[in-house]
């Protein structure tokens, strides 16, 4: 079962939408987040479409890749390129289902997405690609370093009760 990578610009194609939504839900549940206590945010098809509209309305170009194995979505990644400030591009989510990890799918997705990004005329003035990775997520930190990301800062996330 060799995964196939599909890349596109903009909203998720209808034929891939259900798989994209399932993976987004799994990511919020499965990715190491240290001691944060926030609960998973379900991402159904409607939530995915709302998020896409919001990002596009804010001026972002969505650069996306999805890995499929036997027609099942097994991984995805997303880059956000701002039409208003294209100098710093944001590498957003990258996620691979646990059963498919360790096969280079995350790397293949990120590289396919970077190629797609570089094909956009809007990326001509882009200088940096920025991402955030939780320190307990050692595999993603390792992948990001392997493809050229360098640590620029450490972000500390604090949470507390309201009220």
Label for each model-derived stretch:
Residues 1-18, 33-35:
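Conserved N-terminal entry element of GNAT/NAT acetyltransferase domains
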Residues 1-8, 147-163:
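C-terminal "cap" of GNAT-fold acetyltransferases
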Residues 17, 21-24, 51-52, 110:
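Hydrophobic alpha-helical core bundles mediating ligand binding, dimerization, or RNAP-core interactions
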Residues 28-88, 92-98:
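A conserved beta-strand-loop-helix scaffold within acyl/acetyltransferase catalytic domains
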Residues 88, 117-133:
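Conserved GNAT acetyl-CoA-binding A-motif
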Residues 96, 102-117, 142, 146:
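Conserved acetyl-CoA-binding loop-helix of GNAT-fold acetyltransferases
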Residues 97-101, 126-141, 159-162:
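Conserved beta-strand-loop-alpha-helix junction that forms the acyl-donor binding cleft
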Residues 107, 125, 133-153:
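Conserved active-site alpha-helix within GNAT-family acetyltransferase domains
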């Amino acid at each position: 079962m060799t995964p196939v990578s599909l890349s596109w610009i903009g909203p998720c194609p209808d034929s891939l939408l259900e798989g994209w939504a399932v993976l987004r839900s799994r990511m919020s549940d499965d990715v190491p987040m240290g001691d944060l206590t926030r609960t998973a945010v379900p991402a159904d098809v409607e939530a995915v479409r709302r998020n896409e509209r919001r990002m596009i309305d804010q001026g972002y170009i969505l650069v996306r890749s999805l890995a499929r194995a036997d027609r099942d979505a097994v991984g995805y990644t997303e880059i956000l390129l701002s039409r208003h400030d294209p100098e710093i591009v944001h590498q957003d989510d990258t996620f691979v289902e646990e059963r498919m990890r360790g096969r280079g799918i995350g790397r293949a997705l990120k590289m396919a997405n970077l190629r797609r990004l570089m094909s956009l005329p809007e990326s001509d003035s882009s200088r940096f690609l920025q991402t955030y990775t939780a320190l307990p997520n050692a595999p993603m930190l390792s992948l990001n370093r392997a493809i050229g990301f360098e640590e620029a800062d450490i972000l500390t996330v604090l949470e507390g009760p309201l009220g």
